[in-house]
């Protein structure tokens, strides 16, 4: 079991409060035509999609700061006695950004107004962070390759010049691979065991549910001290006063593909990445009108695929070997490989020797009863490549698999609700869940038939919760509190679990042979079976509070953060037993150079001469 607890408490002071989670800030200064500071001006920062309003008052130096704003487009309204009303439209706040909007107020009546409709400049002048922001339009319109898995928001990281590689090789800002951190609405989505983007992506919503994200590569604050090189900041979408919805399907189908030049026919390749989103105000006719107050956002994304198996060549024992006949067991030069009787092992003249089986035939009286019960399942698989007995091709690389597939069905659901309480408070709730499976397709597994198939089924399930509360204590003081919880269960198991194996196959002295078909490995043939349940639970939770306070031309930020992450292993991999068989158990003692040594791992199996064995208790 591994766990990680991080606690940080910070106090920052500077000319402005630097945004650092998925939230942003609008800051600036107001002056009169002579350049003097305008003190006590009343400001309203309005989120245009919901009409949610944040209030601020300019300080004694004319400075203002509106902190903890969701990524969106805002309108700034300013009123002060003796000055015309000022309105700045189209102020775009990105994830983790600080936007400076300065204004010069004109003398006049408050009933008069000056309105600026052009977009405010978004150049970062208040900090030295290197940040790449991928905004909503690019998130919606950028094509992502759907290649064997659901679209991942981490695919978008490639647009940042500071990011290199992918998966466990991803590095950001020159940091080491897998040393980055990724956050969803201010809290980490990473796991305690891996910096793999595939794992972290399971704890993030669908690409369609993200409004934007940012990549910070330097200058990030103490709350991200666990990251090396960079921080990926994801912001989830919220509902607005307008109803919106979408439906989509990213399709790949072999019917639209060209045949490979050397192939006789097109390979089966079918994928669908499809889903929908719905968002808007919560309205219950005649009961409740949630415009300007209550909003929802819902999304579902599903991924289904079916890919034809590539031809795979395996090595399987021949039918006569099951009877003990190794007279056709030859090397690549078609020379007989002698099998030696382990029961004749003795010391002679200072050397350990064995006698060969006459005619390379093992008598049935030496067969292991357990081996015979296991071998029953292997007899159905015989060489199928057409090589003649007595040739190398008959005993190795002799089995062609042309069918079977692995499929990876995945479902992802995201639900978010926002409630504006009066003019000073906002509460947000987010729930995201993902179910990922990796298992054989309808035509069976791509390998030996069950129970001999040595692959595993994967079942990964995640849930991510986010709760946030924003409270404008006063025009110059804003508090943001958030809570997060992540659950991530990775489970892998064979296709043979829980099938009453005790009455069919049972290796003596294992913990529980009823749980799983045993795992059998050979040095010259494809192994049989796979391990039972095993995996990790990786729960985590965290608290965070940020208090932003503006006084004079200074902005102060106080806060604390607590993170608790665990990685708790579980499983019973070899609870049904594992046995490895080597040619050395039926070869010339001390000679490990196969095939000159003689011997056969399958002969060792028939006679019960395990080279290595193990079982495992439940953990």
Predicted regions and their residues:
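Membrane-embedded beta-strands that build the outer-membrane beta-barrel scaffold
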Residues: 30, 114-115, 172, 182, ...
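Periplasmic N-terminal accessory/gating domains of Gram-negative outer-membrane beta-barrel systems
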Residues: 83-238, 244, 251-263, 273-283, ...
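Periplasm-facing N-terminal accessory domains of Gram-negative outer-membrane beta-barrel systems
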Residues: 2-135, 438
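Solvent-exposed, acidic/flexible segments
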Residues: 36-38, 67-69, 132, 146-150, ...
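Periplasmic-side early beta-strands and strand-to-turn transitions of outer-membrane beta-barrels
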Residues: 122, 248-410, 435-452, 487, ...
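Short, solvent-exposed loop/turn and secondary-structure capping segments
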Residues: 114, 126-128, 168-169, 183-184, ...
């Amino acid at each position: 079991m591994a766990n990680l607890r991080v606690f940080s408490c910070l106090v920052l002071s500077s000319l402005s409060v630097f945004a650092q989670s998925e939230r942003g800030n609008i800051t600036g200064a107001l002056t009169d035509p002579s350049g003097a500071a305008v003190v006590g001006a009343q400001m309203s920062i309005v989120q245009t999609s919901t009409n949610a309003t944040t209030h601020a008052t300019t300080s004694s130096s004319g400075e203002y700061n509106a902190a903890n704003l969701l990524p969106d487009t805002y309108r700034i309204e300013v009123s002060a006695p003796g000055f015309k009303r000022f309105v700045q439209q189209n102020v775009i706040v990105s994830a983790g950004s600080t936007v400076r909007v300065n204004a010069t107020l004109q003398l006049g009546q408050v009933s008069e107004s000056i309105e600026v409709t052009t977009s405010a400049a978004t150049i970062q002048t208040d900090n030295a962070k290197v940040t790449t922001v991928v905004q909503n339009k690019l998130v919606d319109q950028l094509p992502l390759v759907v290649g064997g898995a659901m679209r991942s928001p981490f695919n978008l990281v490639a647009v940042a010049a500071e990011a290199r590689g992918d998966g466990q090789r991803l590095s950001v800002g020159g940091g080491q691979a897998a040393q980055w951190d990724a956050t969803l609405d201010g809290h980490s989505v990473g796991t305690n065991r891996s910096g793999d983007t595939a794992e972290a992506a399971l704890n993030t919503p669908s690409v369609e549910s993200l409004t934007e994200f940012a990549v910070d590569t330097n200058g990030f604050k103490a709350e991200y001290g666990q990251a090396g090189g960079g921080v990926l900041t994801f912001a989830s979408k919220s509902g607005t006063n307008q109803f919106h919805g979408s439906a989509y399907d990213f399709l790949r189908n072999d019917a639209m593909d060209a045949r490979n030049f050397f192939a006789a026919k097109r390979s089966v390749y079918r994928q669908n990445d499809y889903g929908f989103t719905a968002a808007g105000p919560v309205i219950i006719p005649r009961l409740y009108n949630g415009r300007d107050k209550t909003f929802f956002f819902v999304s579902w994304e599903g991924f289904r695929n079916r890919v034809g198996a590539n031809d795979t060549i395996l090595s399987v024992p021949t039918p006569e070997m099951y009877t003990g006949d190794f007279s056709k067991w030859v090397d690549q030069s078609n020379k007989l490989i002698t099998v030696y009787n382990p029961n004749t092992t003795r010391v002679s003249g200072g050397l350990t020797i064995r006698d060969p089986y006459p005619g390379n035939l093992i008598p049935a009286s030496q067969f292991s009863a357990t081996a015979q019960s296991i071998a029953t399942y292997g007899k159905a698989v015989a060489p199928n490549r057409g090589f003649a007995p007595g040739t190398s091709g008959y005993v190795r690389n002799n089995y062609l698999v042309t069918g079977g597939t692995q499929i990876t069905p995945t479902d992802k659901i995201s639900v978010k609700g926002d409630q504006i309480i009066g003019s000073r408070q906002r509460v947000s709730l987010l729930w995201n869940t993902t179910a990922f499976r990796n298992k054989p397709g309808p035509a069976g597994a791509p390998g030996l038939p069950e129970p001999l198939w040595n692959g595993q089924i994967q079942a990964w399930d995640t849930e991510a919760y986010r709760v946030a509360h924003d409270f404008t204590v006063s025009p110059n003081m804003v508090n943001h509190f958030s809570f997060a919880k992540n659950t991530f269960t990775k489970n892998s198991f064979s296709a043979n679990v829980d099938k009453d194996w005790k009455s069919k196959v049972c290796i003596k002295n294992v913990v529980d042979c009823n749980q799983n078909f045993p795992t059998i490995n050979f040095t010259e043939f494809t192994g049989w079976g796979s391990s039972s349940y095993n995996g990790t639970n990786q729960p985590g939770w965290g608290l965070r509070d940020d208090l932003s306070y503006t006084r004079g031309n200074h902005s102060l930020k106080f806060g604390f953060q607590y993170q608790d992450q665990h990685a708790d292993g579980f499983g019973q991999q070899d609870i049904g037993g594992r046995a490895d068989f080597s040619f050395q158990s039926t070869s010339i003692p001390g000679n490990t150079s196969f095939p000159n040594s003689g011997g056969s791992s399958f002969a060792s199996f028939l006679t019960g001469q395990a080279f290595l064995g193990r079982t495992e208790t439940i953990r």
